[in-house]
Amino acid sequence: MKVTRRTASIGALGLLAASSLSPAHALDDPLLDPFEGKSDFWLAVEAYIYGYPLVTMEMTRRVITNVAKVAGTKGPMGQIIKLREYPNASFTDVTAPNADTLYTTAFVDVGKEPWVFSIPEMKDRYYLFPMLDGWTTVFQVPGKRTTGGEPQTYAITGPGWEGKLPDGVTEYKSPTSIVWILGRIYCTGTPEDYKAVHELQDQCNLVPLSSYGKDWKPSVGKVDPKIDMKTAVREQVNRMDAVEYFTLLSELMKTNPPTAEDAPMVEKMAEIGIVPGKDFDKSKLDAHFVKRVPEIAFARIMLHFKFSDGDIADINGWGYTTKTGIYGTNYLQRALITAIGLGANRPEDAIYPTSTKSKDGLFSRAYAGSEDYVLTFPKGQTPPVKGFWSITMYNEKYFFVDNPINRYSISARQDLKPNADGSIDIYIQNKSPGVDKESNWLPAPKGKFILMMRLYWPDDKSPSILDGSWVIPPAKKT
């Protein structure tokens, strides 16, 4: 038998999917059955991957907005959520959360009318307010890099909207009805800087166009007791069977239409009962596929991290991509970013190198809290950025790790101590490296963990991660 890249990938998919099945399931329903001449099965897998961002975005919206009033990390539709301090280890609303900025966010439905969003004068402070459509595409991103620090006001309009806007209001047209304003304002975390950022957050304003310039007060949010507010969104999505998943996808596409680029995919999905603007026709989906499609599709999404056809670079144990925020027809890449970093920015705004294994020469091994690691930046070679950089610690599910010093990321704001030669060591371990080294300590859990580096507004001139002229050092076992 000749082993091709496709058969190797299928084999890897089988191993990944099998690991998530019980032994009884694996024996009673052989894993390889769907692989044998079932073109409809693979089409359903494609459709699942295609729709993963939209379904995940909707489930995220439901959980975040299912409250009567703004509180903590949640707030009703059309109301600004202002995080007043960094998220802690209990935060599971969004995978790979940020511990370097104060989120200032809101979900709006621009299907019925536009919403007007105003940003105050930011001066020299780093900030950005990316606007994501239902498919996780960043269709606009006002911020320090793009629009500067002056006061600015935008009307976010939905598909097919035509009308006149007030003077001084710039139109940002969303391709979908769902819009997530996922603002980030840099904050050092000191009491003084918290206060300064809180004042900026309070000056941000969001109102429906019909109430712009009026004394508008948001209504009490509607709470749906049937929505699961405890289980992480990704787990809720992954637990859906194919019928439930495609039913929701079809419903969402009525107000969050595919793009013109998606036409070939839309045509194929019709064969299994998925048609934009119509309810899902489950009679066209083989009943034997209902449980297996989500398992295999999600395994394929995660496998893309290793078999990415160039979408993911792998250097010194760090995987990263410059293909985020705008995806075109690269549905697999879009789904992967949704799974491991929902809300990712455009590469000009941020790059997110991620590492799951320590690499030393030809050898690599999964990170474990039972071992100690060190990452060394040579003198003058900390990450080249115009915004900020950090390294964040996550558990194996991409959530924060509880630790005795409540530190979830490390960056220049820790006042890192250099070595005698000017290099900087970052100590990555479960136990403290000692009082004299704690400024450079990134606490790890006892079990497996993941590292994510954030490079906000990376330099576009050499040395730069954008063109590969700056190389991330490895985290080595000590």
Could you say what each language-model-derived stretch is?
Residues 1-15:
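N-terminal secretory signal peptides and thylakoid transit peptides that target proteins
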Residues 15-18, 321:
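Intrinsically disordered, low-complexity, compositionally biased regions/tails
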Residues 27-478:
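A compositional/structural signature for long, glycine/proline-rich flexible linkers
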Residues 18-24:
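C-terminal segment of classical bacterial N-terminal signal peptides
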